[in-house]
Amino acid sequence: MAKNKIRVRYAPSPTGHLHIGNARTALFNYLFARHNKGTFVIRIEDTDTKRNIADGENSQLDNLKWLGMDWDEGPDKPGNYGPYRQSERREIYTPLIQELVEKGLAYESYKTEDELTAEREAQKAAGEAPRYVYEYEGMSDDEIKASQEAARAKGLQPVVRLRLPKDHVYKFDDIVKGEISFESDRLGGDFVIMKRDGMPTYNFAVVVDDHLMEITHVLRGDDHIANTPKQLAVYEAFGWEPPIFGHMTLIINTETGKKLSKRDESVLQFIEQYRELGYLPEAMFNFIALLGWSPVGESELFNRQEFIKQFDPRRLSKSPASFDQKKLEWVNNQYVKQSDPNKIMDLSLDSLIKAGKIAANPDSKTIEWARHLIALYQDQMSYTAQIVEMSDVFFEEPEQLDAEALEELNNETAPVVLKEFSERLKDLTLFTAPRIMQIIKGIQKDTKIKGRLLYMPIRIATTREMHGPSLPDSIELLGKDRVLAHLEKTLAEIK
């Protein structure tokens, strides 16, 4: 590996599906690596076996690929720094933990969970911040050894804790936030680096992995800032050089003004949910890339290569990023409008089939009808699943006209227009949009009725709606029999 070549990683836990915030972390690391012709690594942090979910890893990787990201090393792309799952690296961690114990930089702790809970409650009652109290205070080496042997004889399993130096300051220069420092005495005491089951804790394993995988930069959410001093303590214990850190600001829900939380059901937060609705991966990539990072210039629409060319972590915002659902819909609409109609057809048809509007495995005639229908709405859709709601008039028989529509028809010319239109449609053999438009223009010429007084009654009567896409195309898609029935029904309602 060339000296100083940038290596970054995205290290998800398979405890859930790909969240917007995690997707942003992956995307920024990906852009940073590609901009600098570096290496992008995927590492699965699966040591929390109680919280891992079935298919969690596959979901993470599949959705990253869907967004348009690729990686150079990972569980499915072995490189020279594997394994790429923490659960497969246990034999790497164990001797390193033992090394720290032998050097006196870490030690076995046999305090039970009940004892630790009682300790924290007493501290809380005294108005003190909770912290681990060293259990061997004042003991000689022989006394410590005897205490540990007695605990083992009782069948107790130890954790291993890293010994923190007193009055020490952990300092790092963050790419986003500048210099940050923590005092060792405020970190809650010596912290666990190996759990009772022999597995390393996150703050130990992540340091070992980043060091051995030669990670040069760590870009992650600022909820990890509190972990950084503990990780620096592990780096110092081994005498290793830490990577350069950059902590991205939180993502705020624009509607609530609060941090985007997985428990907040007021907004969709998982990539799979947007895939199901027919959002386009290029649009999602574009939108997520602007959550807390600003390019040069005023444009808000970029393709992947443009983002790679521009990406500079020094342009990451120090202020929280706003997750605006309406903005996402706008961005996706821009991409939908520019997309190949065949692509939008496939996504929209899938939504119509899932909604039961069109039968599975439709015949060629139905497919062509659907293609015409979907093309009518392509420019209007924020996401392709919207076709189901937008096109409801073509699948469901309408209810009575509402008061606003009836008021629009409450004039002398509306019945004239509708009767003329109905009579002329009956004689129409080629029921196509151009021929329908000819009839409308013929009515205008013969009756001198034009504009809203001409088009609105026809739209309301035929589609039973006051707004919609191209009127002649809509009438063609509804079909002659349905349109004539709608006209008859409307004329009866306005008598």
From Swiss-Prot:
Motif 'HIGH' region per UniProt: ranges: 12-22
InterPro entries for this protein: aa-tRNA-synth_I_cd-bd, aa-tRNA-synth_I_codon-bd_sub2, aa-tRNA-synth_I_CS, aa_tRNA-synth_I_cd-bd_sf, Glu-tRNA-ligase_bac/mito, Glu/Gln-tRNA-synth, Glu/Gln-tRNA-synth_Ib_cat-dom, GluQ/Sye
GO annotation, biological process: glutamyl-tRNA aminoacylation
Keyword Ligase: yes
Subcellular location(s) per record: Cytoplasm
Keyword Transferase: no
EC number: 6.1.1.17
GO molecular function, one term: ATP binding
Reaction equation(s) it catalyzes: tRNA(Glu) + L-glutamate + ATP = L-glutamyl-tRNA(Glu) + AMP + diphosphate
Annotated residues for binding of ATP: 262
Motif ('KMSKS' region): 259-263
Oligomer status and interactors: Monomer.
HAMAP family per the UniProt record, alphabetical: Glu_tRNA_synth_type1 (MF_00022)
PANTHER family tied to this protein: GLUTAMATE--TRNA LIGASE (PTHR43311), GLUTAMATE--TRNA LIGASE, MITOCHONDRIAL-RELATED (PTHR43311:SF2)
Similarity comment: family membership: Belongs to the class-I aminoacyl-tRNA synthetase family. Glutamate--tRNA ligase type 1 subfamily.
Protein's name in the database: Glutamate--tRNA ligase
Protein species of origin: Latilactobacillus sakei subsp. sakei (strain 23K) (Lactobacillus sakei subsp. sakei)
Top-level taxonomy: Bacteria, Bacillati, Bacillota, Bacilli, Lactobacillales
